[in-house]
Amino acid sequence: MDNNNNQRGISFIGSIALLVSAMTGPGLVTIPLLFQISGWLIPTVMFLVAMSLGAISSLLLCEALTTVRGNDHFQRKIELTHLTNFLIPQKKTRLIIQIILYLSIESVIIASIILSSQAMDLMLLRWAGKTCGLSLHPNLGFLCVKDAIDGNSPFGSSYMLASLGFVIALGFCAPLAFLDLVDNMIVQILSFGTLAFIVIVWIGTFIITGLHKDYVPLIGSNQSQVVGTVLFNYAFVTTVPSWVNDLRPDVSIRKATWYSVIITTLAYILLGILGGMTYKMDLASNIIAEIDHSSHRNILTDIATFLFPLAVLLTSIPVYSIVVRYNLERSGLCKRKMAILLSTLLPWIIVLPFQSGFWLNIFTNWTTLLFTSASNFIIPFYLYNLSQKQKNQISSIEIIELAEKDFETSTLIITSSSASATPPPSVPPSSPMLNADKIDKKTLPNVDTKNIIEKATNIISNTTDNDNLLHPNRSLHYRSNRSNENINDNLIITPTSPTTPISPISPISPTLPILPSSPQYPSTPSTTFSQTKSFIAFPASRQCRMMVAMVAGIISIILVGGIIIYDFIKLALGSNEFDLSANS
């Protein structure tokens, strides 16, 4: 039964489908315009930089997760918000970061709901000839439109309570959001296959239509949109902890991560360069609009246009809802019912009166700018740095414990040997040697070394004795990433008792947890667990990984800080434009 549970995890193909889905969205159709106005050199370089930052941030975050005591192989299912409880002792700082993480993912869900609802209404308008909804302002009542109005929504500036597109999106996403992440993998794999079909059809259409090199210069006249448009397409890092917690044992985290970002980057660059060379686009245009008005429109392009909102936009909403629920529930912030309310129902309620107009778009853009950027490209590097510092703090505790164990072992050997040896000659009752022991006991303090070590450990790690106990009804799933194979192996071990400690040291532990005296399965060698290693971001020394984390973190801060400053300057100058991708 345990083996079946292991195989129920997310597969390698499912991992790629999940991560690619998190990195692709409505921004996919606007990339050719970016290459036309900015040239192909700087956007291509920025895509490579963003790809590297996203992958490094994800892998370092995974390594930080394994430093939590008892989570060496992701067996405790520690989520991102839960990780802050272990690494950040300051309550105010921890609360601020948790709020940023929550608002980041919620803003992505809200933006995706808006874009998906609008896309469904436009699809109905295209294929059914009209779409309808319940209007709140300026006219209260049922409203139907037959022609698309300029803007993102077919209803223009009218404020809608609900539209047919919203109902379709809700009916598709809500049932999937109540499932677990593993149960959504079939939908994600189908979405990935559909996305591949769409990209192939578009590229084929570009080639048939004809390419014009002069449409995409080496360096364009406007570079202001490059960083924001490219960087936020890789804002998938917040989904990584939930993914690795449900990962199957035979899946390599490194390979899945790098394959996903490389596939996504190639799709963006190919669509950007080839699409930009095919059509001369204005600032309000995109790939779908240009193909629809081209002479090479055919049944395949119509199918691709029909499937795009379904495969690319809708399928990401349940994933982010599940990630929010996991973070709230697994970290103990709230119970399951409240977690479902906050993750699945609340975003749809917030969106109801704001499906059209511009106020929610402004809110979404700024929350994406401030929260999504920090949670994906700054906080992961910060948490990794904290995890490595905590490792240094507990090294002295490990040395003390090792010395204590050696002392106890040597004492046991001496006691055993003395018990089997010839007893010493008896001492008369009046001998002063008998009183010496009493004198020593009075003069020497009664020191309990083990209690001192435990108290010191709790002080350093900011934990209590209750944190050292494993839940009695929970099994441990050990996943290792061998440096020579890059493959994770899971084995299941049930604690010997409800009070079996996870680790003798702090919540952040680079060593393996205490294991039962014998494995659960007789066929498993007794040396399996002593030979497994915790996951590391990439095969390099710890100093090298910390250096990479520092450099990548500095680059991320410079890029994100530059975008924020740039947009604040634009706002001060009276501009309502934002240097952001449409894909949150």
Can you annotate each of these PLM segments?
Residues M1-L33, G54-L59, K77, I400-S416, ...:
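Membrane-interface "cap" regions at the ends of multi-pass membrane proteins
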Residues A421-P432, P495-P522:
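Intrinsically disordered, low-complexity proline-rich tandem-repeat tracts
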Residues M46, L53-S58, T264-L271, L346-I350, ...:
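Alpha-helical transmembrane segments of multipass membrane proteins
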Residues Q7-R8, I13, L65-K92, I97-L101, ...:
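Membrane-interfacial loop- and helix-cap regions that link adjacent transmembrane helices
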Residues L170-C173, V199, I203, L345-L352, ...:
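Hydrophobic core of alpha-helical transmembrane segments in multi-pass integral membrane proteins
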Residues P32-T67, N71-F74:
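Extracellular loop-to-transmembrane helix junctions
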Residues P26, M51-E63, L170-F178:
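Central hydrophobic cores of alpha-helical transmembrane segments in multi-pass inner-membrane proteins
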